Amino acid sequence: MCARSTTLLATVLALATASAAYAQISVRDLPEIARGRAERLRPKQIAALEPFWADLSLDYEENKEFLDRRIGDASRLGDSVVPMLLEKLRPTQSTTDADNLASNCRRVLQRLDPGSFVDALAELARGDHDTAKREAILLLGYAEDPQSVAVLSSLIGTANSWDRVQIVRSLRRLRAARAATDVVPLLGTDNRELRQEVLAYLAAAQADQVAPTVIQALSTEGDDRLLPKYIDYFAACVRRDAAATDALLPLLNRDRIDWQDTLHLIQALSQVSPERHEPTMRKLRDLIDSNDTSSLAVSAAVSLRALGDKNGVTRLKRTLDDKLRRRKREAALYEQRARLLFAIGDFADAADDYEKIIDYAEGAAMTRRAYLGLLKSEARRRKIQNVVKQMKASGMSPAEFERLAAEDAPFREAMGHDRVQSFLRQLRRSRAPK
């Protein structure tokens, strides 16, 4: 039924846009004509997909590389096979092969613009066939259509635990903020996986309208493994909010989150906290005092500066300068000072420190970090000659430069310069197989 309605819609649209050939056809006749055309096309669809059924009945995880090729081949048959693939989402037999076939047909459909058959997916998702419902929920996450969000939201209240996780994942893929008020109550469930998915969705959708509920959920969250997800949400969605800041500050005690998450929290507070929020500034000053010249101290000083207190940066830089006067070959100290200088926009001095790190580096990982920092610093200074010089010296591959460009806008701009492109062409030729 769903498959045929999809074909019917496509046929009606084609007929409606045709000119001379169909000028004499009555609108009343269009559904019947569409049904007739669908019946005539069905044998061709069956024949086109027949070579694929056995392969698509294999377990995906055990045959991933092979099935990815076959799924790609099947998708290249185009929209004409959509009706047959939709039928396979609703197996008539409860067998492993039938379930595998449904899942792999869904993977083919993912590549065929699910938004063009969202009506059929909505019907399957609202139906009572468990396999079809599951596969349709997953496909709706790839259907860029307002109806997808409406259908997924409507299912939350009655869905089982597994389906709820998939519904929230699909909403996250769609970045559909308007579903947030339906989703956020799920933070009150005892399902940790579901709560984790809810937080990931809210951050991806930048759903700031539900921040008060998330603040309340954080105050009662008993699973420390989820705390980084709360930090991610507030970092992505909340700005200059005292209530959110008050909920986050206790995490700086570091008895519930690790060093890396503490670093992320310090960075997030530079935007989440209101400016000159005294409890935040007091906590950050304490971190500078207790962590000497570590990365935590650097991030705390930079966040303090963003909140209106420049003294933290001044004090920390003075401490680093004093230590480097006594320990002039200590690469780790240069690295912390370079990070501080880069963060406050002093790119020339940061570049000097990154070069010192390269001279005194204590390992390949530190050297690589220094080259990345140096390239980003020179790109911000628009020193193209220096950018090319350091690209040559770094020994990095074209692919590594492309990854850096994808992450860093100023370096991406520098990559477009003629001199940089000329160097990259030479580098690719030198690394090409002989």
Segments from the language model and where they lie:
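Structural detector for internal amphipathic alpha-helices that build alpha-solenoid repeat scaffolds
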Residues: 32-40, 62-77, 87, 97-114, ...
